Amino acid sequence: MPALACLRRLCRHLSPQAVLFLLFVFCLFSVFVSAYYLYGWNRGLEPSADASESDCGDPPPVAPSRLLPIKPVQAVAPSRTDPLVLVFVESLYSQLGQEVVAILESSRFKYRTEIAPGKGDMPTLTDKGRGRFALIIYENILKYVNLDAWNRELLDKYCVAYGVGIIGFFKANENSLLSAQLKGFPLFLHSNLGLKDCSINPKSPLLYVTRPSEVEKGVLPGEDWTVFQSNHSTYEPVLLAKTRSSESIPHLGADAGLHAALHATVVQDLGLHDGIQRVLFGNNLNFWLHKLVFVDAVAFLTGKRLSLPLDRYILVDIDDIFVGKEGTRMKVEDVKALFDTQNELRTHIPNFTFNLGYSGKFFHTGTDAEDAGDDLLLSYVKEFWWFPHMWSHMQPHLFHNQSVLAEQMALNKKFAVEHGIPTDMGYAVAPHHSGVYPVHVQLYEAWKQVWNIRVTSTEEYPHLKPARYRRGFIHNGIMVLPRQTCGLFTHTIFYNEYPGGSSELDKIINGGELFLTVLLNPISVFMTHLSNYGNDRLGLYTFKHLVRFLHSWTNLRLQTLPPVQLAQKYFQIFSEEKDPLWQDPCEDKRHKDIWSKEKTCDRFPKLLIIGPQKTGTTALYLFLGMHPDLSSNYPSSETFEEIQFFNGHNYHKGIDWYMEFFPIPSNTTSDFYFEKSANYFDSEVAPRRAAALLPKAKVLTILINPADRAYSWYQHQRAHDDPVALKYTFHEVITAGPDASSKLRALQNRCLVPGWYATHIERWLSAFHANQILVLDGKLLRTEPAKVMDTVQKFLGVTSTVDYHKTLAFDPKKGFWCQLLEGGKTKCLGKSKGRKYPEMDLDSRAFLKDYYRDHNIELSKLLYKMGQTLPTWLREDLQNTR
């Protein structure tokens, strides 16, 4: 109050002019203060959901970002999250989303795609206290920024709690505001710019593969770039570029010199603002440096969990040595250039050596100058690695006799010995990759017989395209490596005549497909041809420029190894690829073209009876065999009527072995082959293997009460004198604890686990469509088999039907239905079927009822979802549960 009284007395003594002067000073001071707070940060509109619809409006004042509180960043916690990437895409077919997925797939990183929700449910982020995702990627960062409050808070809390980062892309369009603030962040965007001369911030903590020593001179693709600006310490530029024009970017200042400044096209959020680390891109992945930095961003934000080591192994095969036509082969100067380039490449790749594949029959079949080149090449024989093709460059799948194949190989080996070519490299390549995949058994056997081959390579497994899916496998003791192309083919021999122009080849090398192949694959085996090393020597040009480019822009450590050691290294890294996945050769035209014409896909079965065991599969097998159009497999000497191909060691014998169990069809339209292997049902590998080889097959499974199935299996083992089953009661087996002996636990698992019906059917549904699977009621099959067989025939769609009411008869001695023969006789299953054994004890029945309760509930839900009728035993069980 005294201060207020003093102010009043002062005002009485001031003249009106003095009061106006003081007001003027106060207003001027206010303007300076306001200017500091309003323009210390550039103004901008938030690109919210409505931002694209308006190009006008006054931006709200923004306080200086340095005044915002700094939040601690949760360190990446690998043990608390699964190594899975959650990718939010605009649509399943959006280009950027597909490019993101392609890089993840090429790197063999697991991912899950979701359509980005504007409003709606967020995928479940945790499971039993563990994070389900190690990284979040948004194809459109505005979908993240404009999430509804509930989902945004849910996602942000997850990221903070589990140390999960976010990668986002901002792709401007014609409706984007030229300058705007990202809603909720101290970050400004300036969009629809043309940029040039991109450089890398050497201080960025993000960099791993990327080497920051170069500047990408020239215009960046597109005129829809966005750059980022902030003075908050949480933001660190990663890539920077200049604007193309001399005009300054609005809100960055009026100084004419500012147009030459570098602006961030990729920015890293260190998480100091809200505890979440992010990497934001101001465009899509069309610019090759964005792909490189994206790989580093994935590595950084996952604490290197989703990253490859810096080592890259490269092997360059030169196929068709001596094979080329006149005018396409190497001359003396070309051979010298090959040798000199090899030495040059060794400055960046220790011991780099070209790998030469030869067919000796064509030695000295060129011009005189080219024949001289052949001679000089052989004088350098110790300077290169060598591997054999076929003597006459014939495709191995055309040879059906192994001895003839071996004779061809022996001729090539004789040529090698005569000319001092080493024959112990253990590597061979078949012309056109014939016989490698699909497997031609005779080729593998002849290779081992003549050459002791341990390694080969192909571009055909599992398919030629897309190349990122190519994998390796091991068959018959021979390691098969994936082979890559490099943009060079037999007809690409002149630089100026390269398809699409020479710039296309340079684009492939400098940040394009060839660069990405090395970037995303720890081991690359490249296929080139003799013709690529004559004339303009495009092979030498390609790999010299590729290695220089990799050295300039990346920290990759380029290395090489001889083929056998390289294959061993490959399967150390990708041990999960050792087992092959056999596919239907007729589903891929390229595969069919290099598959023996003596083989036919019509020998493959169209129906699988998958089990489980002790549910009536053998009876169904007998009933199906009574149909004139249905033929079962030939019996196996080891496993009787069951082939057991897809679930065990027989799978590695290959599809030729499998087809031998089925006759060559006399009528491909009506003949319908089937096989029954009851172990398939609960196998973890059988569904995927079966779907790959038999993608159109129908699948039958029979279900009885899982408690009865468990008891039947126990009694089956007792009948076969299993010492564990004879030693322990059924109740002791099913209630055995974790400390029980391994043999007892094994018997327990075989009793109980096949009864997890829903779990196993779900696995089959992940490989086959629901309309390819029919679930049969095992209880009904036992009591009314004719009715069940009518359902089966309808499901199979056979052209002729059998009235099983007239062909089946009940045998009271056996206690089940048998085939009715002429004269009223019956043909029944063997003595091992239909055994009589004591009823299950009540304690075991009660235990199993409780044990299978949740499994049976899940089964009912699954069958309802599949649109299939619930078995009678399941309906009764569920009614008694209520």
Curated annotation (Swiss-Prot):
Residues given in the record as adenosine 3',5'-bisphosphate binding sites:
614-618, 712, 817, 833-837
This protein's superkingdom? Eukaryota
Q: Which SUPFAM superfamilies match?
A: P-loop containing nucleoside triphosphate hydrolases
Question: Main subcellular localization, coarse class?
Answer: Golgi
The UniProt entry, under Pfam families, shows:
HSNSD-CE, HSNSD_N, Sulfotransfer_1
Keyword field: Disulfide bond, Glycoprotein, Golgi apparatus, Hydrolase, Inflammatory response, Membrane, Multifunctional enzyme, Signal-anchor, Transferase, Transmembrane, Transmembrane helix
Q: In which pathway does it act?
A: Glycan metabolism; heparan sulfate biosynthesis; Glycan metabolism; heparin biosynthesis
Q: Name its GO BP terms in alphabetical order.
A: animal organ morphogenesis; aorta development; cardiac septum development; cell population proliferation; coronary vasculature development; embryonic neurocranium morphogenesis; embryonic viscerocranium morphogenesis; fibroblast growth factor receptor signaling pathway
Protein EC: 3.5.1.-, 2.8.2.8
Transmembrane residue ranges:
18-39
Q: What is this protein called?
A: Bifunctional heparan sulfate N-deacetylase/N-sulfotransferase 1
Q: What species was this sequence derived from? A: Rattus norvegicus
Gene (name only): Ndst1
